[in-house]
Amino acid sequence: MKQTYITLNNGTKIPQFGMGVFMVPAGDETKNACLEALKLGYRHIDTAHAYQNERSVGEAVRESGIPREEIWVTSKLWPSEYGEGKTMEGIDKMLVRLDIGYIDLLLLHQQVGDYMGAWKDMEKAVAQGKVRAIGLSNFESDRLEEVIAAAEIKPAVLQVELHPYFQQNALKERVAPYGTVLEAWYPLGHGDSGLLNEPVFTQLAKK
């Protein structure tokens, strides 16, 4: 698998294709799935505190034999960890769970709680070298605007549901002036066969 990369607004390059481990059980199942993905050429793994499998992702990264700087790891903070001071504690605990030195991309998972205080701590974590890039997940409308307006470091990534049935064009235009990249979850739809059976995709697949 040949990787392509997208340059974020802070100059770092994120692998365009990644493997998410949402709902993958912690332990060998997550670790082996990540190791196989890395073997096939993936260089981006997406996890979260809420997934409860960060330790297994970290084990796969360490055991892969691939240089750390070649693997991009995204994780997400849950709202229970939001708040100035509290978020930094959450980041430090995440670093222990992953045990890979630093986090490539850290996202706020949901737009509830003290996300403004959390953002301040995330900016500090970037300055301290704990995190390379920061962004948001599932933020929209007024709360997205609130973070953008106050942020010293503009979100590098906004991760949202995004696929051919739900293209989020207005949201993409809204964040474009800040260089914020939209990142898709559910890129192939909701796991059913509807999207993949669309004639345009089946015709492309045959080519």
Positions of the model-derived regions?
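Acidic-and-aromatic substrate-binding clefts and catalytic sites of carbohydrate-active enzymes
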Residues: 24-28, 46-56, 80-85, 111-115, ...
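Conserved, mostly hydrophobic/aromatic
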Residues: 19, 37, 45, 57, ...
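Short, acidic/polar
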Residues: 25-38, 82-99, 117, 142-146, ...
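A structural motif
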Residues: 42, 100-103, 131, 155
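A short, structured active-site edge motif that brings together acidic residues
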Residues: 68-81, 102-111, 138
